[in-house]
């Protein structure tokens, strides 16, 4: 993964563009049971997972990247993509139980954790200076190509 760098990528007519935007915490209820989410986290002092950012997936993306694995948002960070199977109020926020591929994790989400979501976008939303995320492969011409670009709205950095 490349962060904060630059790259020239090829987008076809079919390349999907989506916005990543911040959800207003006061307007959003706690993540519902059975909702698909992706949570970037860091280990706490006792090994517990503490959310850095929570991405609420659209239903069409359920299962995307499902699992628990190292991430590069910051040194030592982890990503857990799964389904919310439980939520409990704790002194430091809300503890979410996530299930994925026959396993599960509990992650504490503090009130100040970033909460973001995706929405469909247009190519016009891709502007110079906006933060983007994409996964790319080399095409037959040796150029980087992608089928989806996620662009941050209003300065939001996509959490991927």
Report the location of each language-model feature:
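Short, flexible, surface-exposed loop segments at domain boundaries
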Residues: 1-14, 18-160
């Amino acid at each position: 993964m490349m962060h904060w760098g630059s790259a020239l990528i090829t987008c076809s007519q079919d390349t999907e563009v989506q916005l990543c935007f911040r959800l207003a915490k006061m307007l959003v209820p706690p993540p519902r049971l059975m909702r698909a989410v992706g949570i970037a986290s860091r280990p706490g002092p006792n090994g517990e997972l503490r959310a850095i950012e929570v991405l609420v997936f659209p239903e069409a993306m359920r299962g995307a990247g499902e699992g628990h694995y190292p991430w590069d948002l910051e040194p030592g960070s982890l990503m857990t993509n799964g389904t919310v199977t439980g939520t409990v109020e704790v002194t430091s926020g809300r503890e979410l139980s996530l299930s994925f591929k026959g396993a599960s994790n509990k992650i504490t989400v503090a009130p100040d954790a970033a909460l973001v979501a995706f929405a469909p976008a247009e190519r016009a939303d891709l502007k110079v200076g906006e933060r983007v995320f994409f996964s790319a492969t080399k095409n037959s011409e040796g150029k980087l190509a992608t089928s989806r670009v996620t662009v941050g709205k209003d300065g939001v950095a996509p959490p991927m």
